[in-house]
């Protein structure tokens, strides 16, 4: 008997050793399941690599690790991501964005009417659902699911090109507030793109996984997700490897686009006060918007950033009206004492036959100015934070980890506002732009049976949970 046990033990050790050597020296298998973050403003795709335990967020053909959640329809084709972004100002009525706000959601006619005024494209109400009307060779009606499917198809193609093999299975994230119909509509969009969804995971849970919180001893986790257009705050209660969403709040009309708009309005006023005209050419407005976005990004790292945009002045715009200052609102557009904006208007080429000339508008924007223009918006971030603490019956001192998600949480002043409120630094160990897609990719690796095996995050459904929105 003892001899048999010895032989059995030796066999087990041999198998374990063989498995270890196989992991060390055999070629690593290619990931078979992708993880997708289908965001409101940007979306991305990632994979978990067996053996190394690393996550790779897959870039597009130009090296972008996320693509704008935009789809444009023209007479000849459908453009997705950055190609769509380039058409946004020249073809606004046929460029659909924010489709995630509409997917699977039931609207009353009054609710939808309140939403559609924000968009240049046409939104229709059909049996309680939203649809989009676009005109290419003819007028066609497209659903939010179809728009989502075009984005998911682009992400699928990016993954297939990177991995060098077809991809059929995915894990996808959705907001914790999504009901069953919204989740099923998201799955339907993936099916249209040729993807089978193995699991739907809540975005806050995915972010917590990216930070490794499913493997450490924490109890209460607050996830602050501030992206391009929405703010979502979620209170997670972690019990072992399980996550329960205790409370949700947010503002679905607050994000990086709003911060950009404040700076854009300010620059418009600077141009108007000097020249008495506002940029009206679509390509110049597009360049100005791009410049504002670049300034915002640069100000996360530097104390000042430069704006330089070439503008066209029509002959009848060359004289500044005497009452120019009264044409634009003053609130939030004028910096306080101590702000200096270095404006340079350089005359360019003039065409006497067409009555047009060009000027180079240059200005230096300080981080202090940017913060002043947006301070009231930054403070609004605290409102849903206070609400989830109230609904969760917790004091802010009881929160174990404050996790930041979304590109707008890079803004130094926003991090400072959060730090001052909680009295401690938020967890910034993960790239906030990639937190959700990283967590989804980890879960995709788990569902695909990748090794080294990670601890899976189990979500406890909370059917009574309602999100409080502050708009």
Swiss-Prot record:
GO terms for biological process: chaperone cofactor-dependent protein refolding; protein refolding. Residues 1-22 form the signal peptide. Its main location: other. Glycans are attached at residue 184. Residues 316-339 are annotated as: Disordered. InterPro entries: ATPase_NBD, Heat_shock_70_CS, Hsp_70_fam, HSPA13. SUPFAM superfamilies: Actin-like ATPase domain. Belongs to the heat shock protein 70 family. Binds UBQLN2. Has peptide-independent ATPase activity. This is Heat shock 70 kDa protein 13. The lineage of its organism: Eukaryota, Metazoa, Chordata, Craniata, Vertebrata. The gene is Hspa13.
